[in-house]
Amino acid sequence: MPILKNLGVSDPKVPRAGTLPLRSSRNPFEEVSGLEEEEAGELGSLPNGTSCRRRATLEKLAGLAPFRLGWAPGRRAGSPGDGQPRSFLGRVLVPGIRRSSADFGLLARLHGTRAHGDEEAAGEAARRLAFLRLGRGSKPQRASLAERVVPAGEAAPEPPPKVPEPPKMKEPLSVLEILSLIQQRELARADEHILELEAEELAPSRGGAPGPPKAEGAGGGRRARDVALLYEALQRELWALVRETLAGPGPGACAGAGAVAQLGQVLVQEEAADGRRGPGAARKLRARWAEAVARAARERLEAAAPGAPGGLAGQLEALRARLLEDMAVVRGRLAPAYPAGLGAFGVYLRGYHGALAEWLGASARRRLPLADRYALLHWHNQVYPREVLGLVDMAALENGELGPLLSPGTLRGLEDECVTDVKAQTRAALLRVLQEDEEHWGSLEDQPSSLAQDVCELLEEHTERAPRISQEFGERMAHCCLGGLAEFLQSFQQRVERFHENPAVREMLPDTYISKTIALVNCGPPLRALAERLARVGPPESEPAREASASALDHVTRLCHRVVANLLFQELQPHFNKLMRRKWLSSPEALDGIVGTLGAQALALRRMQDEPYQALVAELHRRALVEYVRPLLRGRLRCSSARTRSRVAGRLREDAAQLQRLFRRLESQASWLDAVVPHLAEVMQLEDTPSIQVEVGVLVRDYPDIRQKHVAALLDIRGLRNTAARQEILAVARDLELSEEGALSPPRDRAFFADIPVPRPSFCLSLPLFLGRLPLSRLARPSLACLPRPRPPSLARPRAQR
């Protein structure tokens, strides 16, 4: 190869034809000022349109370009690697598949002196660039031969058509570049490069050609650590994005659906990669995503509850509002941005459900007051299913995915604590209310009693709240409250009995005493209704408590009715004493006094509740007729003629009609009493024995408690002394009495003749013949004709004699 020497030229800047421009100095590291300007000014384009940089020089043709040792096989010197000119060091060093993973160690020095240091001087940069340009070969100084071939002024030939270059392979990113993508929230792209890096690290172990041995710290172990660190950084950004998208206003909320979509794409990519990794090496990023959602939900709920006023009830209301707010964000903005296969809405719903279950479980383990337990149970059983889960997509609730917030054992424990506290609190409160009300019973002032209202309010507070939680809890609470009510009513009965037995109370004015008694009676109906309602709601074993409550109230009502009736009839007794006398046949004064007194007391009795009032009026109606008939059957008046019997019967009918009008005005329901006096009047007036027998049969049928002694006394009053007729009439009563011996006796409120005692029945003697010498006037006297029936011999007398 000929060696071209530099021929001396007068002007070094003007090259001659056929000569190569050479430098005055052969030192390749010598800095030459203006070298870059000369290159820019001298390099042009060929007439055919191609760049003059492509011209062939002798050094390039002969392979004499400096630093040839740095060229990689298969690549032209100075050819760009990725569209950019390679530096001198780039041509010297053999490029690897990816930049060394040691670059990741520079992360700790990114914020060092270089990051914040002064910029280097322009001269140093120029010298470094001049040094790097040495590997590019000699610089052309004049036009090439092709420039002289094309005459001036002629058009250059058309360049050949460009052949499309094959697609260039994307160069893998370095660890620092992947980290930069993560920090810029380009999560899907960063995950793709991490997967590539992981695949490169796993390639030798999957049957690839074994590479050269690598030094410790620079081989596969370092790349594996890089992958692990990149995954940690990626997950930090992913879970931070989950928190920020739920946090409302902030950087995460402004990220939009794009960032959430990238998160979902990462999950899909990693799930596909887990299928390739196998079960042992799977990263399970989808499960960790669900855990991150649960952590974010827990943070959201814990931040909402503490600042809410109103105790536990206020905190639960704040939780409800936060749940509705966050689930609306998930349903409207976050869930649509995720891929459909991830089931994002269900994941978020389960995350919030689990976080809420933890919060409620921690609250249930604390010692809560009764009101907070009620609030917790009601929120768990009613508010959450109806107002939270009822407003979300029911597809997430299929097959019981969510499960209960609290375990059945925890719920049962809370209910047991509620029942125990209610039992203790209500019994103490009921006794306190009874003691306070009893203090006013003996006072002379007429104060309205609020005992029944206070008792109902104390118990209904619990019996109304418990069924709204659950039916079973309502039954248990009703049984508990009914037991407490039964104990209270037994104490109430005992104190009412002591009140009426107190001699000082009997010294009160009748009107005051009646008013106090009416107040006690009025406690019965609301308490009775409460007991019946609790028994209907409660379990079957509540029946004994209901019966005990009803028995105590019945006893109190009967006692108070008897007291009121006794007070009234003490005032009426003088008028009843005037009945069935000679003056009674001609003057209605006695009955007018009875009717007037009862009518005057009706205003006071109207203050009584309807149920006890009806029972009291019926009792007054019965007792009034008993007191009216009593003097008649005691023989106070005797009829010696048909005219007298007719007058007595007429008077009886008039009085019966007047009493019937009185008690109708008092709204008495004891209509069965209206016929007793008219029946007696018929027996008094009828003359023939069969008619009397029929009337006696009707009387015995309607009033089963009538006995032969009552019929015999009635026959004595009307003056029936015929023995045969008496026996025929009494036989009717005896037959009906014997036929009904096995039947049950009428109830106490239907008894009439049982309360009317009569003298011992009399019988007629058949006088012997020696009495025939007595005057007929003596034999006609009733005292001789009818004598008292001898007492039957006692069965105990023979034993006494022995």
Curated annotation (Swiss-Prot):
InterPro entries found in the cross-reference section: EXOC3/Sec6, EXOC3/Sec6_C
Protein name per the record: Exocyst complex component 3-like protein 2
Keyword DNA damage included in the entry's annotation: no
Disulfide bonds: none
Family to which this protein belongs: Belongs to the SEC6 family.
Pfam families xrefs: Sec6
One GO term of the biological process aspect: exocytosis
Keywords associated with the record: Coiled coil
GO cellular component terms listed in the entry, alphabetical order: exocyst
Disease: Brain malformation renal syndrome: An autosomal recessive syndrome characterized by brain abnormalities, Dandy-Walker malformation, and renal dysplasia. Dandy-Walker malformation features agenesis/hypoplasia of the cerebellar vermis, cystic dilatation of the fourth ventricle and enlargement of posterior fossa.
Organism: Homo sapiens
Database matches in Gene3D superfamilies: Exocyst complex component Sec6, C-terminal domain
